[in-house]
Amino acid sequence: MPSYGSLHSPSLRKMEHSRGQYGGGRKGMSLGNVIGDPFALATISIAGLAWLIAFIASIVAQIQTTQGFPTYTWWTVVFYFFLIPGVFVVVASDTIQTYHVALVGYMACGLVLTTSSVNGLVYSTNGAKEAAAAGFILLSMVTIVWIFYFGSAPSAMPRAYLDSFALSKESTSNNRQTMTGGGYGIGRPETSTSVQPPQMYTSAQLNGFENPSPVNGMRNSGAPPSGFPTTPGPASGLPKTTTPPAGGAADAEIVPPTEYPYRAKAIYTYEANPDDANEISFSKHEILEVSDVSGRWWQARKETGETGIAPSNYLILL
């Protein structure tokens, strides 16, 4: 098992190749992403029912009143005929973070259409028009909720709370044990943050830069600094460097950070990969200390003192 900080550790491979792996594989549609998400299932079902009420009532109202029926209402019906299935496809394919901006734009247009249709139908004495207005009112309410949800960042507290009820997101940590080799991160929830991790140096690379003498001793001594040669010669006073043998760099250790200036809260339960000693497990709502918030994997420390890396999309900063 690779030791902590080993250059061949799976954790470091995940951190170094996070940019290439992000979005590297396309996911197919899964009905479980909708059924396992109570928020998506409820809102899509209500929107579909509201559209059906508005559609049938508009047909009846058009037949009963040949004149005076607002024709732009039909454009609202057609618009939501494509918008509601579009939301279903995005949620089922787990590509919310990819298309959430487009969804919010279309939903904003749909909200204008539904409210205009309500204004043209709700004041009528015809029962069919009032039923159509009720359907459009329900569509408007669902659209407002959708705009707030899809327009919020995944780390926003209301959205994180709603996502905590999704079974598909909770089961992601259980499925990642079946992944091997370069497939790390393919089955995990995607995040919009993908920053190259900071450069890390090994002890072999830093050899020769240490100063073994105290600063005061150097000032009081009449001898020249150790970094300068005292007699002519080929690099007599230069710091000595050691070339590690073949394979030696692979086992070089990286000292873990000692400062953890950030605090993060776990929004999901995570089980560490048993094949990677650098990962740590944590439970939902557990508070962790984080040293670096760049990249998809964060260096974290638990309250028990255990340190390791944790996926950033399972945490929110406090």
Swiss-Prot record:
Compartments (UniProt record): Cell membrane
Topology in membrane: Multi-pass membrane protein
Keyword vocabulary terms for this entry: Cell membrane, Membrane, SH3 domain, Stress response, Transmembrane, Transmembrane helix, Virulence
Stretches of the chain found on the membrane's Extracellular side: 60-71, 122-130
Pfam families tied to this protein: SH3_1
SH3 domain: residues covered: 259-318
SUPFAM superfamilies cross-referenced by the UniProt entry: SH3-domain
Residues spanning the membrane: 39-59, 72-92, 101-121, 131-151
Protein name: Cell surface sensor SHO1
This protein's record includes keyword Membrane: yes
Cytoplasmic side: 1-38, 93-100, 152-318
Transmembrane helix as UniProt keyword: yes
Disruption phenotype: Reduces only slightly appressorium formation and virulence.
Main localisation: membrane
Induction details: Expression is significantly reduced when PMK1 is disrupted.
GN (gene name): SHO1
Protein function: MSB2 and SHO1 have overlapping functions in recognizing various surface signals for MAPK PMK1 activation and appressorium formation. While MSB2 is critical for sensing surface hydrophobicity and cutin monomers, SHO1 may play a more important role in recognizing rice leaf waxes.
Biased composition (Low complexity): 237-250
GO terms for cellular component: plasma membrane
Source species taxonomy: Eukaryota, Fungi, Dikarya, Ascomycota, Pezizomycotina
Ranges for region Disordered: 1-23, 172-255
